[in-house]
């Protein structure tokens, strides 16, 4: 790709050697193995597991917490430059793979993001919101992504009880403070796309009120998923609120489809304006679309049309479109592999063979 070449060869006992432009990488045998027609694919699957070890830590730290002192936690840290546990990062990673590859450490990482109320007497557990534009909650309100990960780990009874407690507290809090009954959607920033002018109008760099009062496709889909989980768990607990959660989810699904869809361009918009002007802005994002498809909240024909028309280049699919020439590269003008992975899942659900092939190729090239 782009004038660069790499090849992989199988070695002894399930190991591999990757010959890449920057040198050789020796990949040890891993607990999970794939056996496909591509040695490169199998090697990269092993490499992903080998690199996962670099994120396994016994303590985490962040300069914003306890003066940067280590906090004991057998967790997955976010990365070399982010040696902490962040709600959306660990949740998306867990939903995609970590919950299956290392359920215990994933569960411990998720538990680190649960908190009691700071006032010391309000009952319940709540999911911590990551920082974002304007600080944190409620400008950013995608903390419910935590439940996207937690749903895979409910076989642990103690953890399942925590999930149920956190669902009740977090959903009640968001219903009171973030949900807009007039519009029928939850307010707040796009999930993951949390750098103001990178994806929102340039003037939001100095004024985040618009972001906090707007409505994002991705974040509303995550709220929908959390409500469906609450409906299921409430039913299992014999809790009459199961009917409320179902009604809220059903109504939210209708509003997501009705308000974010633009028939003239055949796409679901990334976000729409505040209640006074709830119009879709001319911006689409691949994560929001993919999450909507996977949640089955978007009608199949519209979903197929939108995914098939989403822009793609030789390197893969950008996370947002259109891109802004005057803005630096980060979310803007960029491909993020985890978003490509969700696009791949969405394509598989819709049997979109060209998109499946393209996203696999993009992920392999990036790796």
Over which residues does each language-model region extend?
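Acidic/polar, glycine-enriched structural segments that form the non-catalytic walls/loops
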Residues: 1-83, 157-159, 164, 168-176, ...
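Extended glycan-interaction surfaces of carbohydrate-active proteins
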Residues: 3, 35-84, 108-136, 179-214, ...
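Aromatic-rich carbohydrate-recognition surfaces in CAZymes
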Residues: 83-190, 216-224, 334-356, 360-361
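Solenoid-repeat scaffolds in large eukaryotic assemblies
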Residues: 106, 242, 249, 303, ...
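Alpha-helical solenoid scaffolds that mediate protein-protein interactions
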Residues: 113, 153, 167-170, 174, ...
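Short coil/turn linking the two alpha-helices of tandem helical-hairpin repeats
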Residues: 154, 231, 235-238, 297, ...
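Short, glycine/acidic-rich hinge or "gate" loops at secondary-structure transitions
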Residues: 162, 185, 241, 245, ...
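Active-site neighborhood of glycoside hydrolase catalytic domains
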Residues: 217-259
């Amino acid at each position: 790709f782009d004038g660069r070449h790499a090849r992989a060869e199988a070695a002894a006992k399930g190991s591999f050697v990757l010959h890449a432009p920057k040198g050789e990488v020796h990949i040890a045998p891993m607990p999970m193995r794939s056996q496909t027609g591509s040695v490169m694919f199998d090697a990269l699957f092993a490499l992903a597991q080998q690199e996962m070890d670099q994120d396994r830590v016994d303590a985490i730290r962040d300069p914003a917490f306890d003066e940067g002192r280590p906090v004991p936690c057998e967790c997955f840290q976010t990365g070399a430059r982010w040696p902490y546990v962040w709600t959306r990062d660990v949740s998306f990673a867990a939903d995609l793979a970590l919950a299956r590859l290392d359920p215990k450490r994933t569960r411990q990482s998720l538990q680190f993001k649960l908190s009691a109320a700071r006032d010391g007497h309000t009952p319940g557990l709540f999911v911590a919101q990551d920082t974002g534009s304007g600080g944190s909650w409620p400008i950013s309100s995608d903390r419910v992504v935590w439940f996207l990960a937690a749903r895979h780990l409910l076989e642990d009874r103690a953890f399942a009880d925590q999930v149920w407690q956190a669902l009740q507290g977090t959903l009640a809090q968001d219903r009171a403070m973030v949900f807009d009954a007039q519009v029928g959607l939850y307010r707040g920033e796009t999930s993951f796309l949390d750098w103001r002018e990178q994806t929102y109008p340039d003037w939001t760099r100095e004024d985040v009120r618009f972001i906090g009062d707007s409505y994002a496709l991705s974040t509303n889909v995550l709220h929908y998923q959390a409500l469906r989980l609450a409906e299921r768990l409430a039913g299992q607990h014999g809790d009459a609120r199961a009917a409320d959660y179902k009604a809220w989810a059903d109504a939210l699904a209708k509003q997501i489809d009705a308000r974010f869809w633009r028939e003239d361009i055949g796409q679901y918009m990334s976000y729409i304006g505040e209640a006074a002007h709830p119009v879709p802005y001319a911006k689409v994002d691949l994560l929001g679309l993919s999450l909507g498809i996977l949640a089955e909240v978007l009608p199949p024909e519209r979903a197929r049309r939108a995914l098939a028309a989403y822009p793609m280049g030789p390197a893969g699919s950008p996370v947002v479109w259109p891109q802004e020439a005057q803005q630096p590269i980060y979310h803007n003008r960029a491909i993020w592999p985890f978003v490509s992975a969700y696009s791949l899942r969405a394509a598989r659900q819709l049997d979109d063979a060209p998109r499946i092939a393209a996203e696999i190729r993009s992920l392999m090239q990036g790796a």
